[in-house]
Amino acid sequence: MKKTLAALIVGAFAASAANAAVVYNNEGTNVELGGRLSIIAEQSNSTIKDQKQQHGALRNQSSRFHIKATHNFGDGFYAQGYLETRLVSAQSGTESDNFGHIITKYAYVTLGNKAFGEVKLGRAKTIADGITSAEDKEYGVLNNSKYIPTNGNTVGYTFKGIDGLVLGANYLLAQERNKYGTGVGEVTSQSISNGVQVGAKYDANNIIVGIAYGRTNYREDVSQQDDAGKKQQVNGALSTLGYRFSDLGLLVSLDSGYAKTKNYKDKHEKRYFVSPGFQYELMEDTNLYGNFKYERNSVDQGKKEREHAVLFGVDHKLHKQVLTYIEGAYARTRTTTRDTTKNTSTVKTEKEKSVGVGLRVYF
């Protein structure tokens, strides 16, 4: 029977987890090690911030390592600890290959039951992370975190007791606090103070439906006089609707989002996007994918931004643990700024193009 596109994509992204090495398995305790090394060769150019040069690079692309320990108590109850690290650029230095530092991306503990769901505590993904359906390896044109945070310091609940259905809720806590000065221990300016989000996604019987809503509060640091215009709260929503034509190996989807940002002593901002996309199985172990995005961000009687972006890519599994791909993206942003005192407007257009060839080796 022909493999469905979803199965291939899930297999490609979950290879490190599904094929992780079991280093210990005894009396209900299981410890796994896994990860991937990823390299991308790319060419890009941009007119953002008046940059006019073209750049080539050979760099790390989200290489990672994880360890997962699961302890089964019996009667479906379990506890789990998970730690994932990433290779990133050094905070100080000029290296551009993104291999400078190792950071902790996720670190959390889970208590759960197969029938009743699980509670997760720590630095982890939220329910908003998996809502949209668009596929990408590196140059994703969607930025869901502008609408709802997709990870953070969280207490979350997830229920997967019904086949194909995932229900989730998260409460976000502050993750960044001042270490120096008079505000030691206070949440840093413009970082998350707290937030809440809920979501649901159904993926079964060739139908994909998902929606999430979140309200996130940010520290605006109002004691500073120059904080007018800094965001205080973001109310956002994300949704997806898709259908999988199993016989054709084709998935078509439509992602969308809306957010309203409340700014301190300033006019509020509104943004939304719509993004149709597709994923197509060209042949066994080879997939074609792409999506288009239109996004608009506006302030009443103020600055307006419109972005058009498109992405296409092809990936191929050389081996169950080796994935290669070619991906390219183009984005065009048009910004209109209105000067109410002079009753004039200025328009600026920025463009960004990128294309890359990548290789991932899972272990």
UniProtKB/Swiss-Prot annotation:
Homotrimer. It comes from the Bacteria. Keywords: Cell outer membrane, Ion transport, Membrane, Porin, Signal, Transmembrane, Transmembrane beta strand, Transport. GO terms for biological process: monoatomic ion transport. Belongs to the Gram-negative porin family. Pfam families: Porin_4. This is Outer membrane protein P2. InterPro entries: Gram-neg_bact_OMP, Gram_neg_porin_domain, Porin_dom_sf. Residues 1-20 form the signal peptide. GO terms for cellular component: cell outer membrane; pore complex. It is found in: Cell outer membrane. It is a multi-pass membrane protein. GO terms for molecular function: porin activity. Forms pores that allow passive diffusion of small molecules across the outer membrane. The gene is ompP2.
